Amino acid sequence: KDLQTKRGTAHDNNWDHAYGNKQRTAGGNIYFGTILEHILLQNLCAFYDVGEHNEMRLHGADWNDALDMAWEKGESVAFTCAYAGNLKDIADCLKHMEEKTGISKIEMAEEMKCLLAEGTELYESPDRKQKLLDEYTSLCEHNVKGGMILVSTEQIRKNLVEKAEWLMQHIREKEWISAGDDMGWFNGYYDNHGNAVE
């Protein structure tokens, strides 16, 4: 925990050094999340953090060593593709975990429930995805409530696979650049002008 909030786009003005660097609940207790919860959180938030082309935002990252930081409009198709793979891999790991351990439910912070939203209508709308992410990050901008929810591993797996498959289909449909004669390539990213550049 620190001053950064909303995926590095805002500051938690209620945070100070006395609060410390550990996430706390509304009751002041340190919140201890699981590693799995953290992995889900990182990947699900990235799914919703998209630009106008519905690809994951760069947030000023120098992803291609070209120093095009692209803070406002930068989007990475390559990162989006990688996260699609992550979501599928996490779903596979959950299946393996359930088969090996019998664990069929995952406990997570109640604020995360909205990140498990689903449906093509949501997925296809960058505005709706950004709004959902903003709602989530607002819920835990300073503290989390401390309440927990139990979600079946099967429900989480299905959710992750659905998101991964949507991402891959989206890239196939929207990011292929044809050079004719059945040749072409996939766009790699969008620059700070919103142009497909690679």
Located regions from the model:
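Acidic, mature catalytic/reactive cores of soluble proteins
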Residues: 1-198
